[in-house]
Amino acid sequence: MGFLSYFRSQKKRSASVAKERLQIIVARERSQTATGPDYLPMLKEELLDVIRKYVQVDRDAVNFQLDREGDCEVLELNITLPDQQDQAAAHDRG
């Protein structure tokens, strides 16, 4: 019986090692998604380009915020639009 218990104890050790490794992988994935997906900077630039096709806004007038709500991530986009008069003057100049 001592011989069999030796192998059983290794299974417990390998299970705990596997559990630790899985926890490390999960923690690493969570830390990477905490800063946002890899495509987020490019998405921001493309959205800014689309907005600028219709409204002349400064880069500082557009605010992007990535929030996590439970299992979902929400990309919030806030744009400070220029006044109608400012937009008309810019359109007349351009």
Curated annotation (Swiss-Prot):
Any GO BP annotation: regulation of division septum assembly
InterPro entries per UniProt: MinE (IPR005527), MinE_sf (IPR036707)
Family matches, as Pfam families: MinE (PF03776)
Keywords linked to the UniProt accession: Cell cycle, Cell division
Tree of life domain: Bacteria
Similarity comment text for this entry: Belongs to the MinE family.
Role summary: Prevents the cell division inhibition by proteins MinC and MinD at internal division sites while permitting inhibition at polar sites. This ensures cell division at the proper site by restricting the formation of a division septum at the midpoint of the long axis of the cell.
Name of this protein: Cell division topological specificity factor
Organism: Alkalilimnicola ehrlichii (strain ATCC BAA-1101 / DSM 17681 / MLHE-1)
Gene: minE
